[in-house]
Amino acid sequence: RFWNRLGARFYALDLRKYGRSMRQGQTPGYVASLDEYDADIAAALDAMRARSRGRARRSPRRLVLMGHSTGGLTLSLWAARHPGEAAAVVLNSPWLELQTGAIGRQAIAPLVAARARFDPLGTNPVVDLGFYTRAQRELGTLPDSPEGWRPERGFPTHPGWLAAIMTGQRTIAAGVDIDAPVFVLLSTRYTSPMHWAPAMTSTDSVLVVDDIARAATRIGRRV
């Protein structure tokens, strides 16, 4: 409603195995490569253009992409592979680097790759202690959505999925070139999520802000 009041035609996309796109028996959030989402984004753009057909001549529209967390990583890679598609990109706390930092990511990459090869759907250790959900609840910003869309401690994650994330982050670290201007939003501070702290309601307790800021300098020339 906020964007519509500003005159935008706002579309929310739930990628495969998330939210409204979840189907019975699926492994929540699992993909073996972030490139798999290209088909989802293409289908969404086709649907948007079909709805706008006939109105485009009267009021041509620019495409502004918005992504958060994993969606921010996914959109960064997609926009770099599809020059000329987006007029601008907005990234809200994009997961451009692993919480271990670049050195830690490189150190564990061989182990993650081996597990992804031999046991892609195995279970990774649980790292979500529920503090993100608690912080949202205390602020009154916890989305009113079906319980199955996001459990309190998140969904289990799998080696194949983590390998896909780390491959995307390695690509970002090597540098990509999004040709559109990119606006990156980050918290000013990071709070470790190992123990609950009231600061989690006003800082980022998921992403290491300084690492994300450094990674963001490698996604384009207008960031």
Regions found by a protein language model. Give the residues of each.
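Alpha/beta-hydrolase-fold enzymes
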Residues: 68-70, 74-157
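Active-site loop signature of alpha/beta-hydrolase-fold enzymes
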Residues: 18-21, 97, 192
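Conserved loop-alpha-helix segment in the C-terminal half of the alpha/beta-hydrolase fold
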Residues: 191-223
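Alpha/beta-hydrolase fold nucleophile elbow
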Residues: 53-69
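Active-site nucleophile elbow and catalytic-triad environment of alpha/beta-hydrolase enzymes
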Residues: 153-174
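Short beta-strand/loop motif that positions the catalytic acidic residue
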Residues: 178, 184-186
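Conserved alpha/beta-hydrolase
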Residues: 2-24
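Alpha/beta-hydrolase active-site loop
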Residues: 30-51
